[in-house]
Structure formats: C-alpha cells, structure tokens
C-alpha cells in the first residue's frame, strides 16, 4: 500500500512522462507500440520507492553471493498504462546492448478482476502464459529469453518495472 501511495504522489505531481521506444535519433513516443507513462526510481529516493529499490538491491547482492549471477546494477521505474493502452510484443534487451539480464514487474493494482485485461502475455516454449496484474505480484524472467506483450486493460494498470543488469548497466 505504501508503494501505491508513492506512485499516486508522483502521478498527482505530474512526474509520469510518456515512455519512448528506440534509441538515439530513432527514439520516439509511439503509443501504437508502447502506451505507458513512466517515472524513474533513483537510489537516492526516500520513502517507499527508495526502500523497494533497496530491498531489490539486497536481493541482487544475495543472488550474486549464493548463485554467482554477476548482476551489477538495478534500474526501476513506475509505469502507468491508461485504459486501452498496452505494449506490443518485445523482449527487454536494450538497443544499447544486452546487459539486461532479469526483468522484474511488481504490480500495484488493488481489486483487479478477471475481465479487467492488462495481462502480461509471456511467450514460453510451452505456449503463452497470461499473468494478471494483481497487486503484490512480482514477476521475474530472463530479459533476452522471453518475448512478452502487455495486453490493453479496461482500467488503469500500475506497476514498478525494471531490470537487473550485468556489465556497465
């Protein structure tokens, strides 16, 4: 609930900006491809957002120590999809390089119901898996391995989304 409050505060302050696709001179807002508005979470952020980032950083360090994952950094942002918006099929390897290793999505949507839409469609070897964006659900998957789509929802869809990196980050 505290993280949802931090999201609401950023939204009320007008800090969520339309997300772009592409890189360099090809970078552009393309609502037909990606329909979310985002606000980056920084290590220096205080309150629930900073605490959430700190907790995931602790998980990164534990994974490195116990599983030798070699994860170097973490980046996260709040994401808001307005009703009817989604994100076309893609994988999370950055155009700048393949340093994204694990993708993370933490959902903030209270009282989500079947029929609200907004599912994450994750493509697996056994076929697509639909994951409803219900509050307090954390989804993690290999960034370069799994193509995925955010299906349009009939109501606002909120999450914290990010990546563990290997390399420069």
Can you annotate each of these PLM segments?
Residues 1-103, 107-138, 144-169:
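Fe(II)/2-oxoglutarate oxygenase catalytic core
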């Amino acid at each position: 609930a505290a993280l949802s409050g931090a999201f609401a505060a950023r939204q009320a302050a007008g800090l969520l900006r339309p997300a772009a696709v592409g890189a360099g001179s090809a970078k552009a807002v393309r609502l037909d491809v990606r329909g979310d508005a985002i606000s980056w979470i920084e290590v220096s952020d205080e309150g629930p957002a900073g605490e959430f980032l700190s907790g995931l950083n602790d998980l990164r360090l534990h994974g490195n120590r116990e599983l030798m994952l070699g994860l170097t950094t973490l980046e996260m942002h709040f994401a808001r999809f307005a009703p009817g918006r989604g994100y076309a099929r893609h994988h999370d390897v950055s155009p700048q390089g393949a340093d994204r290793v694990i993708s993370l999505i933490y959902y903030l949507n209270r009282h989500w119901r079947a029929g609200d839409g907004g599912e994450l469609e994750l493509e697996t070897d056994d076929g697509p898996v639909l994951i409803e964006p219900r509050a307090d659900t954390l989804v993690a998957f290999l960034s370069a391995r799994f193509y995925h789509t955010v299906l349009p929802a009939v109501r606002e869809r909120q999450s914290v989304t990010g990546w563990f990196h290997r390399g420069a980050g």
